[in-house]
Amino acid sequence: MASCPKAIWSWRFQRVVFRSVQLLCFSILIFELMTQKEVSAWTYHYSDKPYSWNYSRAFCQKYYTDLVAIQNKNEIAYLNETIPYYNSYYWIGIRKIDNKWTWVGTKKTLTEEAENWADNEPNNKKNNQDCVEIYIKSPSAPGKWNDEPCGKRKRALCYRASCQDMSCSKQGECIETIGNYTCSCYPGFYGPECEYVRECGEFDLPQNVHMNCSHPLGNFSFKSQCSFHCAEGYALNGPRELECLASGIWTNSPPQCVAVQCPALKSPEQGSMSCFHSAKAFQHQSSCSFSCEEGFTLVGPEVVHCTALGVWTAPTPVCKAIACESLESPVHGSMDCSPSPRAFQYNTSCSFRCAEGFTLRGADTVRCADSGEWTAPAPVCQALQCQDLPTSNKARVNCSHPFGDFRYQSTCSFTCDEGSFLVGASVLQCLDTGNWDAPFPECQAVTCAPLPNPQNGEKTCVQPLGGSSYKSTCWFTCHEGFSLSGPERLDCTPSGHWTGSPPTCEASKCPELSAPEQGSLDCPDTHGEFIVGSICHFSCNEGLKLEGSNHVECTASGRWTAPPPSCKVDTVSAPAPGLRCPSLIAPNQGTMSCQHHLRNFGLNTTCHFGCKAGFTLMGESALQCRPSRQWTAVAPTCRAVKCSKLPVTEPIVMNCSNPWGNFSYGSTCSFHCPEGQLLNGSERTACQENGQWSTTMPTCQAGPLTIQEALTYIGGAAAGTTGLVTSSILLALLRRRRRQKDDGKSPLNPQSHLGTYGVFTNAAFDPSP
């Protein structure tokens, strides 16, 4: 927005003039509101108070017509000269609507030639300047426009229209001018107030013409309309309606009425006509009668009359020869008639024939007799019949019969059941000779390729439909010492393939063997195939006895001659001296249970370990004494279950007892707060066997301070301060005295070599230099 203009007069003189103008305008406004008198010219008005744009428009619409709508440069100059200066300027009737500057009173978009913006305007600062002000008496841009936010407060510049409801007699457009208005008359009107209507004048009516008129604005004046019609028997020659135009001229000349004329008639062929005319030939009220020659009949009325509409009461009749009923070509055939192929008159003869594949049923020629009847009924064309299909070919048939069952162009398709295939054509058609186009097909069973007997085996088959045909099943077996590799059964499928490849017979194998625990295995089959005839020998380590056969053989059935043996302690022979393991004891906080076979902790002794609640076993839960006189693992231990470390923050104080290690099962911790604070939570917690503390960590919170405690704290603080000063003085004196007696020795180390607070080393053995 442009800055306010500089003062031209002294500020005192400006203030006096401004207040006087304000008072005068306000007085005029009050007088107009009280009298509510009509004015006869376009006048301008403004508010004495500033308002927002919306409120300013409401003010103008309430007391006047609307915010001012500027029409030309002269109006701008007039406003700038007449309206007093106001530092915030005036709102006018332009606003941005749908992003276009629009005159709000007429809803018309501001055109480029009507723009009167100040330099660099509109600039739309902050994207919200949607309303327009006018710089009245601005030194830098008088009468120019500027866009401003609609919420700013400015004076409302209003206008009161000169045009009223009855201006220009409601027959013209009232055009506002400064202090007056002019009338632009609508077409058909004239005069200063458009009070006169243009006239077209009357006209003489021709003979036999009747007229009916309407005169909304005066006799034979603008918008008068006249319609015309004629007496019966006469037709209108010219326009049916006339209208008086805005130019004072009728739309056309008046019409005339002429006598109605019917079309001329002629005698029908093979007949005659006789007419009576009242005036001219074939005019209104003329009549004509008709008759036919012998052998013909009249089709139509015997007499016709010319009507007032200029048409005959009926079409002209004709004389028609006696004819037989119409014939049509038979379906799938043709017809040839003479002498007339369409009229079917007396003595007309028609012959018939059929298309290929069809035969004629009925007379091939008929004739129209003098009785009007044909000598025989019309024939029909029937499709040729083919032989019926046999029912013994085992095929499924699906047929279509366009002209009847198994007749010409009948088509049949053949399919076979699962496991069989069609031999012959899959589709047959009935030809125009009455024969099928191919022999009847048949279904034959699907066959699979013959299966060979497996080497070293046998094959057994069941074939219900013949050799190796669909639904055949074969079973396979192997000779002794051989096992079947592949399917035991094969079936012939509908596709002509077996359900799998033929199997083979391979040499039988026995299950794989392994050495017994604390023993060995010796087999001649180095590749571990364990085929029929393989022999394996077993043995045990020293001090053990073989239980079972010491050798086994693989038989033709694929089984060993005996189960694999095992190695056990020899209870008959005395064990080797000293064959025992070191003695074991139960772990601390744990248990031990042993099973001794020969002696305590002897060979094969097994010991099981466990821990008490709150402890976890670290190591193997079971140990066994081996022949090497060593246990299978190191003896396990029991370790206490750990709880999470408790976080201690000031000012809370914690004391813990840890019988099995810091923060372990059985650890208990107690809590207390300094004097003057309260414990929020449990004062004791314990580490449980599940590794969780029994309660959550408590906290300290400030408690109420009594007068006695306050005095105690103040007194203690004072005493502490005094003691600190006294101690400092004494310490300074003591250090000064000791420096005088220093013999070169180092002072005692106040920290124990054990790292324990409050325990000091002997000065005689202090290693410090």
Swiss-Prot record:
GO molecular function: calcium ion binding; calcium-dependent protein binding; fucose binding; heparin binding; integrin binding; lipopolysaccharide binding; oligosaccharide binding; sialic acid binding
Endpoints of the signal sequence: 1-32
Domain notes: The C-type lectin domain is required for binding to integrins. Binding to soluble integrins alpha-V/beta-3 (ITGAV:ITGB3) and alpha-IIb/beta3 (ITGA2B:ITGB) is cation-dependent. Binds to the allosteric site (site 2) of integrins and activates them. The interaction with integrins may mediate cell-cell interactions and cell adhesion.
Family: Belongs to the selectin/LECAM family.
UniProt GO BP: calcium-dependent cell-cell adhesion via plasma membrane cell adhesion molecules; cell-cell adhesion; heterophilic cell-cell adhesion via plasma membrane cell adhesion molecules; inflammatory response; leukocyte tethering or rolling; positive regulation of leukocyte migration; positive regulation of leukocyte tethering or rolling; positive regulation of phosphatidylinositol 3-kinase/protein kinase B signal transduction
Record's protein name: P-selectin
Gene that encodes the chain: SELP
Domain C-type lectin: 58-158
Record-annotated membrane-spanning stretches: 718-734
Disulfide bonds: 60-158, 131-150, 163-174, 168-183, 185-194, 200-244, 230-257, 262-306, 292-319, 324-368, 354-381, 386-430, 416-443, 448-492, 478-505, 510-554, 540-567, 581-625, 611-638, 643-687, 673-700
